[in-house]
Design a protein with these regions (language model features):
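Catalytic core segments in nucleotide and nucleic-acid processing enzymes
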Residues: 1-170
């Protein structure tokens, strides 16, 4: 093994911090980061990626939540696509994470609370052998509303890798 190996303990917070050698920016990946404050019900996402960009006083946070299920019945009239993808209920959970996790703003405005999560993504078990998932509504929605799903299985990490590289490079 020539890479870094990280052991995670279920139910325990684990955090890895990196400094981008090209930019000096701090990248933090937290597993089980604990309850995230909201004004209603606290939320507990699985993984939170935080990017602290140079020249910005706002940390950019993204939820990556592993779900071990897939919508295999895209013929359901309520499913928004004809190909397999993440469950609609899991996409709704990503909306909840992104929209409900907030912090109290110290900037005087009519809105006292601001969102802390810039995006939220379901990691779901799909091997996408033909590469067609790029045409799926829940992949395209990442670009438009910063919520969606990414296939994640051993050997099927290319879309996630490309997306992470884009986040870090921005």
């Amino acid at each position: 093994n020539t890479g870094v190996t990280i052991s995670l303990v279920k139910g325990k917070k684990s955090e890895v911090k990196f400094i981008n050698p090209r930019t000096g920016e701090l990248i933090t990946l937290a597993y089980n980061p604990g309850e995230q404050n909201t004004q209603t019900v606290n939320q507990k996402p699985d993984n939170v990626l935080t990017l602290e960009k140079k020249g910005s006083n706002v940390p950019y946070k993204y939820v990556f939540d592993a779900k071990y299920r897939i919508e295999n019945n895209p013929s359901d009239p309520f499913y928004p696509d004809t190909k397999p993808g993440p469950k609609v209920s899991d996409i709704n959970t990503m909306h909840r994470y992104r929209d409900s996790i907030v912090y109290e703003s110290d900037t005087p405005s009519r809105f006292m609370f601001e969102k802390t999560m810039f995006g939220a993504y379901v990691l779901f078990p799909y091997d996408d052998p033909d590469g067609e998932y790029k045409n799926h509504r829940f992949y395209k929605s990442i670009e438009t509303v910063n919520i969606g799903g990414l296939p994640f299985l051993p050997g099927t990490t290319e879309l996630l890798e490309d997306f992470l590289a884009e986040l870090v490079a921005d």
